[in-house]
């Protein structure tokens, strides 16, 4: 009888999910010329690049931000996806590029790395520099 009570008390803890978020270093996108960064060209380039890399992207005109999501792992008990976002800079400053990894499911955070580096974002920064649109710098 006591064992069944303990089991019933632990059952919700077993089936409750865990959400863990890890982020890469934030980057500012600085134009290569003295002219301000063309957001339309930036979002168009970002949409093409990340869509080709397997992300689902959307931009929001009212908040002027851009967001892409890619599923990295989708198994019955655990899902992982990467999110890439471009936000407008403070007070009209340079846009901010942020990437995070979301882990959701039954695997506790003790077994998931808190370190995350998105190789797609590094490749996108190289792409922007080669296209002479912008350069990525680590945000302070």
Describe each PLM feature range.
Residues 1-7:
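Bacterial N-terminal signal peptides that target proteins for export
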Residues 7-8, 93:
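A broad, structure-centric signal for solvent-exposed, well-ordered loop/edge residues
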Residues 14-17:
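C-terminal motif of bacterial Sec signal peptides marking the signal peptidase cleavage site
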Residues 19-140:
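Ser/Thr-rich, low-complexity intrinsically disordered terminal regions
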């Amino acid at each position: 009888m006591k064992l069944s009570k303990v089991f019933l008390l632990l059952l919700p803890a077993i089936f409750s999910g865990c959400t863990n978020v890890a982020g890469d270093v934030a980057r500012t996108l600085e134009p290569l010329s003295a002219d301000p960064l063309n957001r339309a060209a930036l979002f168009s380039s970002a949409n093409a690049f990340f869509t080709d890399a397997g992300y689902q992207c959307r931009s929001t005109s009212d908040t002027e931000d851009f967001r892409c999501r890619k599923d990295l792992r989708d198994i019955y008990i655990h899902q992982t996806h990467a999110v890439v976002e471009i936000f407008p800079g403070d007070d009209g400053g340079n846009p901010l590029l942020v990437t995070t990894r979301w882990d959701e499911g039954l695997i506790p955070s003790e077994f998931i790395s808190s370190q995350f580096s998105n190789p797609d974002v590094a490749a996108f920064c190289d792409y922007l520099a080669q296209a002479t649109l912008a350069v990525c710098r680590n945000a302070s």
